[in-house]
Regions:
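Long, amphipathic alpha-helical segments that form or neighbor coiled-coils/leucine zippers used
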Residues: 203-210, 214-245
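P-loop NTPase "switch/coupling" elements that transmit nucleotide state to mechanical/effector output
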Residues: 4-189, 196-199, 228-254
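Canonical SH2 domain fold
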Residues: 193-197, 209-210
Length: 256
C-alpha cells in the first residue's frame, strides 16, 4: 500500500470510526512555498502570509485559509482544487516540474465530555533539487531552482543538527520551509520521510546525494525514539537499586 493510500485510509477511519460520544472537528489548510513566499492554495486571493509564533510556542501562518471538512470526499475535493493552483513549469528534464514545496495540514480536535485532544498532521511534498547544468534552467526557472535548492540545503542543515547526539543550535530560521516545519521536527512529533530516487544511470549522482540525505534523516531521533536512551538508563538504575537492596538484606542476615 502506497503512502497516499495509507493517508486516505487513515482519514476514512478518522471520519467513520470515531465513537458516538466523541465530537470531531477537522480543518484543512494547503499552501506552497514559492521563491521563499508563502501562497495560500485554497483561494485565488494573493495576500501576504507570514509565519508567527503562538503563545503556546507552536507556529502558525496568519491569514491562511482553513476549511472545515467532515468527510474524506471533502478533503479530496479541496486537495484537487488546491493542486490546480500550484506553481509548475517545464525544463529539459521535466515538462511539468513542481516549482514549489507544498504543505497540506489537517488540524484535528476531539472532544469527549470535559476532555479535549488536539493534533496536527502535516503532509509535505518537497520539490526536487536541481542541477542547473542538466535542467538548462534560465530566467524564472533559474530563480525557482536556486530558491528550491537553497531551502533544501537549509533542511539538510536542520537534519544534520538534529542528528547530533549533543545539544546544539538548530537553524530553523534559515528558510521559510524549515521555520514552518519546526513543530513537525520537535521532540513530540512523529515523522515519516520518503525519498524518491531514479533508477537511471544518468541520475546516479543525484541518487547518491538523495540516499546520503536519507541516511542522515535516519539518524535523527524524535518523540519516543528520543526517549529510549533515558528509559534504558532509568531501567539500569532500578536494576542497580534492586541489586543493592538484595545485598543489604544479605548483609543484615549475616549480621544476625
Amino acid at each position: 500500500m502506497c503512502i497516499r493510500d495509507r493517508y486516505f485510509r487513515a482519514l476514512s477511519e478518522l471520519f467513520h470510526g470515531k465513537p458516538s460520544d466523541v465530537e470531531l472537528c477537522v480543518k484543512l489548510s494547503m499552501l506552497e512555498i514559492y521563491n521563499e513566499t508563502l501562497i495560500d492554495l485554497l483561494t485565488d486571493k494573493r495576500i501576504k502570509l507570514e509565519v508567527k509564533r503562538c503563545g503556546d510556542g507552536t507556529h502558525a501562518v496568519q491569514g491562511l485559509t482553513t476549511q472545515p471538512v467532515a468527510s474524506l470526499e471533502e478533503v479530496q475535493r479541496h486537495v484537487e482544487s488546491g493542486s490546480t493552483r500550484r506553481q509548475t513549469g517545464s525544463h529539459d528534464l521535466n515538462d511539468r516540474s513542481s516549482r514549489s514545496h507544498l504543505i497540506l495540514s489537517l488540524d484535528v480536535e476531539c472532544r469527549r465530555k470535559d476532555e479535549v485532544l488536539t493534533s496536527r498532521l502535516n503532509l509535505v511534498d518537497l520539490a526536487g533539487s536541481e542541477r542547473l547544468s542538466r535542467t538548462g534552467a534560465t530566467g524564472d526557472r533559474l530563480k525557482e531552482a536556486q530558491s528550491i535548492n537553497k531551502s533544501l540545503s537549509s533542511l539538510g542543515d536542520v537534519v544534520n543538527a538534529l542528528a547530533k547526539k549533543t545539544q546544539c543550535h538548530v537553524p530553523y530560521r534559515n528558510s521559510k520551509l524549515t521555520y514552518l516545519l519546526q513543530d513537525s521536527l520537535s521532540r513530540a512529533a512523529r515523522v515519516l520521510m520518503v525519498v524518491n530516487i531514479s533508477p537511471l544511470e544518468a541520475d546516479a549522482s543525484e541518487t547518491i546525494c538523495s540516499l546520503a540525505f536519507a541516511a542522515r534523516c535516519r539518524d535523527v531521533e524524535l518523540g519516543a525514539a528520543l526517549a529510549r536512551p533515558e528509559a534504558a538508563e532509568l531501567m539500569r538504575a532500578k536494576q542497580e537499586i534492586r541489586a543493592l537492596k538484595a545485598r543489604l538484606d544479605r548483609l543484615a542476615l549475616a549480621a544476625k
